[in-house]
Design a protein with these regions (language model features):
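C-terminal catalytic-base region of ester-bond hydrolases, centering on the histidine
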Residues: 192-290
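Positively charged n-region of N-terminal signal peptides that target proteins for export
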Residues: 1-4
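Solvent-exposed loop/turn segments at secondary-structure junctions
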Residues: 36-40, 70-74, 103-108, 131-135, ...
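Short, solvent-exposed loop/turn and secondary-structure capping segments
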Residues: 42-46, 113, 138-140, 214-216
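Sec/Tat signal peptide C-region and signal peptidase I cleavage site
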Residues: 17-23
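Bacterial N-terminal signal peptides
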Residues: 8-16
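Active-site catalytic motif of lipid deacylating hydrolases and related acyltransferases
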Residues: 23-98
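Serine-dependent carboxylesterase/thioesterase catalytic core
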Residues: 35, 80-182, 233
Length: 290
């Protein structure tokens, strides 16, 4: 792991001995992994957000970079941070474009940057993994609770304090972050103003907890969302995750939750391995000429 500048954590893949590395994930353009809400490239300073995914992709020939931004802010704020980091990546590598893979909210602020911040000429492909393109009932419930009790400001303020005091993250705005994850905001404000751009290949994946074994720590949320939006990963429904060319729903043997999609803070998931899955995404992008 190498820091190029403040605000960006980069996995700059150098292959001094190409013969010792695989090439099936050696895409034409660098791969950029962008994290979701509530964390950055490191989760609360405890563990890497992407775990062994970058290493496995590297071992198969990929050049991988990881962007890192404010975990709780508006889409616009995060998009500006992301744009600056991608521009730096392009300058360092000399590449003309990148392949973007975003998990959860990482598939939303990147969409905004591509559509509204002039980044479409620099993005060859866009892949979202369980991104709430049509919002999440979980965000609806949290924001409605705050409105009903009149505690929205207090709850958001407490969360901002936690991020700042306990985890050293400044400049968060949990209230606007939460609002911009609701189904109403995504459907009526975000999507109409964030059109897909010509020249960018869009694809997506979703996931389903499927069983209590797959749900793990997110089982309660999975069960709560199921009657409302059907199959879901404990935060994002399959119907909300679909964008562009939908490549399928990840389930493993017993189900996959929002965290186990990237192997984060979860028990082993039978029938699914996150590093292997992301490497397959890269291999497919390579086959498509990206």
């Amino acid at each position: 792991m190498k820091k190029i500048s403040v605000g960006i954590i980069v996995f700059l893949i150098v292959l001094p001995m190409v013969s010792m590395a695989g090439t099936k994930a050696a895409t034409k353009y660098p791969i950029v992994l962008s994290h979701g809400m509530g964390a950055n490239a490191e989760v609360m300073g405890i563990t890497d957000y992407w775990g062994n995914i970058p290493k496995t992709m590297r071992n198969n020939g990929a050049q991988v970079f990881i962007t890192s931004g404010n975990p709780m802010q508006s889409k616009e704020y995060k998009a500006i941070e992301w744009k600056a980091q991608v521009q730096e990546i392009l300058a360092i590598t000399g590449a003309q474009k990148i392949n973007l893979i975003g998990h959860s909210d990482g598939g939303l602020y990147t969409r905004y940057a591509i559509s509204n911040l002039g980044m479409s000429p620099y993005v060859a492909s866009y892949t979202s993994m369980s991104s709430p393109h049509r919002g999440s009932p979980v965000a609806d419930a949290i924001m409605n609770l705050g409105t009903t009790t009149g505690l929205t400001d207090a709850i958001a303020g407490a969360l901002d304090f936690v991020y700042g005091f306990l985890f050293g993250v400044s400049g968060t705005d949990c209230e606007i972050n939460g609002t911009q994850e609701t189904t109403w905001w995504m459907k009526t404000v975000f999507n109409p103003n964030v059109p897909d751009m010509a020249g960018v290949y869009y694809q997506s994946y979703g996931a389903d907890c499927k069983t209590v074994i797959g749900g793990q720590v997110m089982t309660a949320l999975w069960l709560a969302i199921k009657p409302i939006e059907g199959a879901n990963d404990g935060l994002v429904s399959v119907s909300s995750a679909k964008w562009g060319n939908y490549r399928g729903t990840l389930t493993g043997w017993f189900g996959i939750n929002h965290l186990s999609e990237i192997g984060l803070l979860s028990l082993p998931t039978l029938g699914y391995d996150a590093p292997t899955h992301f490497t397959k995404i890269a291999a497919d992008l390579k086959a498509r000429g990206f």
